[in-house]
Swiss-Prot record:
Annotated keywords: Cytoplasm, RNA-binding, tRNA-binding
Oligomeric and partner information: Component of a yeast aminoacyl-tRNA synthase (aaRS) complex formed by methionyl-tRNA synthase, glutamyl-tRNA synthase and the tRNA aminoacylation cofactor arc1 in a stoichiometric complex. Interacts with rar1/mes1 and gus1.
SUPFAM superfamilies, per the entry: GST C-terminal domain-like, Nucleic acid-binding proteins
Bias type Basic and acidic residues, positions: 213-225, 233-247, 262-272
Biased composition, class Basic residues, residue ranges: 248-261
GO MF entries: tRNA binding
Signal sequence segment: none
Highest taxon of source: Eukaryota
Its biological purpose: Binds to tRNA and functions as a cofactor for the methionyl-tRNA synthetase (MetRS) and glutamyl-tRNA synthetase (GluRS). Forms a complex with MetRS and GluRS and increases their affinity for cognate tRNAs due to the presence of a tRNA binding domain in its middle and C-terminal part.
GO biological-process terms attached to the record: formation of translation preinitiation complex; tRNA aminoacylation for protein translation
Name of this protein: tRNA-aminoacylation cofactor arc1
Residue stretches spanning the membrane: none
Organism: Schizosaccharomyces pombe (strain 972 / ATCC 24843)
């Protein structure tokens, strides 16, 4: 494989594949090597940088020192450059941090190089925010890589200095950074270097509205008389016989107008009543779990990356299933998600949906509600008798819609899941694709769904 780095873009080229990566503002020089040798210590010993590589030791030593603390190994800076030294040491001690596939290796090399480059930190953060729209980690699906560690150390002080408003605009980076900084091994390494935790709030900042000053009614009364009052006072002061006749006539005309107005006026309309909660208000969708890991701060929670058909990419979802479902069963599978609950922070990780499960009456068994086999990712689900209505964009917690409807969700004797009311069970199916079949529990009969 040959790495050809140009001033405008980087091309990673090898037989039958071509990748064009992010823009670079500096030049690098690499030896020609094969993909089979990309992990070998000999490759990293040969990896060299041109004179365009930065020589400011303060920035570089921070990344190297942090990763040394994380791996609990010594990484000396050599004449070949920091990335060469780093990759050589990691390949000997923790090769799994350098990627499994060819593409992962290339991504890790690219982002690690950026972390040690003279590119402005703000530019790296903006590129990373775009890159992380559809990823939990920088390169490896399975977890942290050396690129995550290097970039974390590079942008740490920048993220710590962001305001809440600035952080919300970079929500992909901040979500990733918050997840990385709460990993136990990362926290230990950071504490040893006095790197503080960044205070990250992924909620939208409140809009400051100017306060409205109400005028005092007394001031209004004590002010000058209005023009209308002046006219009335003039009308109440008729002069002579002619003035008295005019006053009488005016009073009669006003009375007639008032009578007509009273007849035209209708009874005031009653304010519209709040809609009764119905199951169609909830946005059930087919989701696909790309990967799941254990929550860094909660032993009972998984953190999953789930594709729900959103244009913005996958969602991060926390679920309390550690006690009931093994981690290996949380990977690469279709599930049903509730997609319009208000996002909530669960031990510093924002959860953007909920996995829909069936539980036995005694809560000893909790299992996924299974979607129809041929349902597609992002398909909406609906209930019989409610399939003509659209779900709410987001459920208002104050209206308690979920709390009102959820007790009616159940699995029947035949394991088919639905919403049960006085008229019977309304079965759950893919909207517009009822022929695919109904959603079912795996083993739980007459269970609760939530």
């Amino acid at each position: 494989m040959s790495f050809l780095w140009a001033k405008e873009f980087c091309v990673l080229k090898y037989p039958y594949k071509l990748f064009i990566t992010h823009k670079f503002s500096y030049l690098l020089r690499f030896e020609t090597v094969t993909l089979n040798n990309i992990r070998s210590p000999q490759f990293y010993a040969k990896l060299t940088f041109s004179h365009h590589q930065p020589t400011v030791s303060g920035t570089m030593s921070t990344e190297l020192k942090f990763i040394s603390k994380y791996l609990q190994i010594s990484i000396p800076e050599t004449k070949e450059g920091p990335v060469s030294s780093l990759f050589k040491a990691v390949s000997e001690q923790k090769p799994e941090l350098l990627g499994n596939t060819d593409f992962e290796k290339a991504q890790i090399l690219e982002w690690t190089t950026k972390a040690f480059s003279p590119i402005e930190t703000q530019s790296i953060v903006e590129q990373l925010d775009e890159f992380l729209k559809s990823s939990t980690f920088i390169a490896q699906d399975s977890g942290i890589s050396v690129a995550d560690l290097a970039v974390y150390a590079r942008i740490h002080s920048y993220i710590c200095g962001l305001s809440a408003k600035e952080g919300y605009k970079l929500n992909n980076v901040c979500r990733w950074f918050d997840f990385i900084q709460h990993q136990e091994s990362v926290m230990e390494a950071a504490n040893s270097m006095s790197m503080k935790l960044a205070n990250i709030d992924l909620n939208a900042p409140k809009i400051q509205r100017p306060s409205v000053i109400k005028k005092d009614k007394k001031e209004k009364k004590e002010g000058k008389p209005s023009q209308e009052a002046s006219v009335k006072s003039v009308e109440k002061a008729p002069k002579g016989l002619e003035g008295a006749k005019k006053e009488k006539q005016n009073k009669k005309e006003k009375k007639d107008k008032k009578d007509k107005k009273d007849k035209k006026e209708k009874a005031p309309k009653e304010p519209p009543k709040a809609a009764t909660p119905v199951p169609s208000m909830i946005d059930f969708r087919i989701g696909f779990i790309e990967k799941a890991v254990k929550h860094p701060n909660a032993d009972s929670l998984y953190v999953s990356t789930i594709h729900c058909g959103d244009a913005e990419g996958p969602r991060t979802v926390c679920s309390g299933l550690v006690k009931y479902i093994p981690l290996e069963q949380m990977q690469q599978r279709k599930v049903i998600v509730v997609a319009n609950l208000k996002p909530v922070n669960m031990r510093s990780v924002k959860s953007q949906a909920m996995v829909f499960c069936a539980s036995s009456p005694d809560k000893s068994v909790v299992e996924f509600v299974l979607p129809p086999e041929n349902a597609e990712i992002g398909d909406r689900l609906t209930f019989e008798g409610f399939d003509t209505e659209e779900p709410e964009a987001q459920l208002n917690p104050k209206r308690k819609i979920w709390e009102a409807i959820q007790p009616g969700f159940t699995s029947g004797e035949d394991l088919i899941c639905g919403y049960k009311d006085e008229s019977g069970l309304h079965r759950l199916f893919v909207k517009g694709k009822k022929d695919l079949g109904f959603c079912k529990a795996q083993t739980v009969v007459n269970g609760t769904l939530s």
